[in-house]
Amino acid sequence: MKESFYIEGMTCTACSSGIERSLGRKSFVKKIEVSLLNKSANIEFNENETNLDEIFKLIEKLGYSPKKTLAEEKKEFFSPNVKLALAVIFTLFVVYLSMGAMLSPSLLPESLLAINNHSNFLNACLQLIGALIVMHLGRDFYIQGFKALWHRQPNMSSLIAIGTSAALISSLWQLYLVYTNHYTDQWSYGHYYFESVCVILMFVMVGKRIENVSKDKALDAMQALMKNAPKTALKMQNNQQIEVLVDSIVVGDILKVLPGSAIAVDGEIIEGEGELDESMLSGEALPVYKKVGDKVFSGTLNSHTSFLMKATQNNKNSTLSQIIEMIHNAQSSKAEISRLADKVSSVFVPSVIAIAILAFVVWLIIAPKPDFWWNFGIALEVFVSVLVISCPCALGLATPMSILVANQKASSLGLFFKDAKSLEKARLVNTIVFDKTGTLTNGKPVVKSVHSKIELLELLSLAGSIEKSSEHVIAKGIVEYAKERNAPLKEMSEVKVKTGFGISAKTDYQGIKEIIKVGNSEFFNPINTLEIKENGILVFVGRAISEKEDELLGVFVLEDLPKKGVKEHIAQIKNLGINTFLLSGDNRENVKKCALELGIDGYISNAKPQDKLNKIKELKEQGQIVMMVGDGLNDAPSLAMNDVAVVMAKGSDVSVQAADIVSFNNDIKSVYSAIKLSQATIKNIKENLFWAFCYNSVFIPLACGVLYKANIMLSPAIAGLAMSLSSVSVVLNSQRLRNFKIKDH
């Protein structure tokens, strides 16, 4: 069983990887992925051995709060921005108090500056009050940090909580010594770290605020889509408008769509017309004109006039629901490149705590001053600096932040990745296999000519009547041609479809019930064919005389022109060093002509579904990383076989199960865009990881004091600033993907 839920209380990648590690050890858990950024988890488990409630209890034991739905954040007295502003104000107050004697002129009264027991104590008490206020503003670090430590799952908050608490306790001890006159000399006099506590917390709060703002912006794509989802719709019942919940709509319901309202579910216009904003599907801002017979898709907005539509999908299976599911899965899943960071994060925090303790002991022994409290002060500064400067957040944010921003960028291009692995793998593709009809071509073959051995209207009636039972694009072209010429469409029975060949049905022909067949030449038993010299898609119409013999009645010649700009986009793809193939069920002449015209390297014609599978299998056995690009209707087996499957979809044509990448703008440029975006994203992730590893590799030793003899020591305050800047730099670097642009050359 697969389930998705939310987890509150996570602060860094050590939290998410700790949950994965803990639950992953359970025999009944098959797979689990936890996303820090959108606080979600996807889990697959054996429902015969456990249930979701038991899994929730396991997570709660680790100190986190699992929930089936993400509750709204509790409204606090102070907003995040106000809390941050107060933290900055009180930090500056404490820092000024601690440095008052060094400032000239000082705004502090003389009574707080004199070097004596009373003034030092009074100054320190004011610093303590300011520090306690800042600690209260940043109390979440202590609540989450110590809770995680208690459950033996230490995280970034644990490091901050331990470091600042140690500094506070030491300062309180020093305050006690000053108050009771137990200090021995000037080295132990007034060694307070209240300003360090404040500065550390302030910098971390600033960094976290920047992270959260950036994360919220990256999550805007999904939030915007969810806002497009209407909760109710107007259902027509007995000529009356009734407002109903969208979840109650079933296929076949007649709905009224008013100007300015969103389409509730996928459907087809049956009365009226409208202009729809389909930018959430295609990325194109211009409204699309819709008339009777046109499809409309959930989440799109009606700009002008009202119309009636018939629902063709329920809410769960509508286009908008599938897009939201894809985005959620993409944001919740993990790329393979993130596994290294997860492994490091699992041991990072415990290792940092061990290093900090070791550094404290070493400095307590080797500190150069003879006074214990001086040595203790140096050792404590090193201890706090090591804890605070280490940044598991930079490692944890390196991959998911880039994936999050990349998915937002993809949606603006009309692209949707099924998961992070799809986004990661697209850049590795070296062979692309294209379907022809509906992918490279317009997908709407039109009849060029008809060659008939019987009365033309009778042939059109037979072919149109049978083909109306099919959803194939060629069938639609024939049906439309028959309707335009007012051919009467008959009732069919015993309709049978042979995938890749054609369709047959029993109908009235010359007063007798006959089996009429429509399809390619291989669908028929040997018959006398007409000599057709035209290039195009040949569709034969025949009558079954017996099980082994068919009579030819006529031939339709159709053509399907390439989409505008396809040739240029194929050239772009080939410039990336990618081999291209065309697999089509069309005849050799048409497929060859299309391949040569578009500059495609190789082709296979008359390809049945099994032929396509065999070719893809052959390419993969040669070591090729294969991407299949199809329309998602008749290519599901081939799409499933590929390393990366791209579906060129229009609304409800999308098959989420078959696709790794879905393009709603129905443009081959999307393939090039997906590959380039994948390349840019992985490059961005590698930059983030390089910075995160280098930062921790360099700054942790510096915080330990390895350059002490060169007079380089990092104070806890500077360590806090460096830690905040490291995670912020990763976030800001990820944001550069927002400016990603597809070059046309």
Curated annotation (Swiss-Prot):
Extracellular-side positions: 105-124, 173-194, 367-379, 706-716
Cellular compartments annotated: Cell membrane
EC number: 7.2.2.9
Annotated binding of Cu cation, by residue: 12, 15
CDD domains: HMA, P-type_ATPase_Cu-like
Catalyzed reactions: Cu(2+)(in) + ATP + H2O = Cu(2+)(out) + ADP + phosphate + H(+)
Domain of life: Bacteria
Cytoplasmic side: 1-83, 145-151, 216-343, 398-685, 736-745
GO terms of biological process kind: copper ion homeostasis
Disulfides per UniProt: none
GO molecular function: ATP binding; ATP hydrolysis activity; copper ion binding; P-type divalent copper transporter activity
Membrane topology: Multi-pass membrane protein
Keywords: ATP-binding, Cell membrane, Copper, Copper transport, Ion transport, Magnesium, Membrane, Metal-binding, Nucleotide-binding, Phosphoprotein, Translocase, Transmembrane, Transmembrane helix, Transport
Transmembrane feature ranges: 84-104, 125-144, 152-172, 195-215, 344-366, 380-397, 686-705, 717-735
Active site positions: 435
Annotated ranges, domain HMA: 1-67
One GO cellular component term noted in the UniProt record for this chain: plasma membrane
PROSITE patterns in the record: ATPASE_E1_E2, HMA_1, HMA_2
Pfam families linked to this entry: E1-E2_ATPase, HMA, Hydrolase
Top EC class, one word: translocase
Stated role: Probably involved in copper export.
Record-linked NCBIfam families: ATPase-IB1_Cu, ATPase-IB_hvy, ATPase_P-type
Family: Belongs to the cation transport ATPase (P-type) (TC 3.A.3) family. Type IB subfamily.
Name of the protein this chain belongs to: Copper-transporting ATPase
Native organism: Helicobacter pylori
Taxonomic lineage: Bacteria, Pseudomonadati, Campylobacterota, Epsilonproteobacteria, Campylobacterales
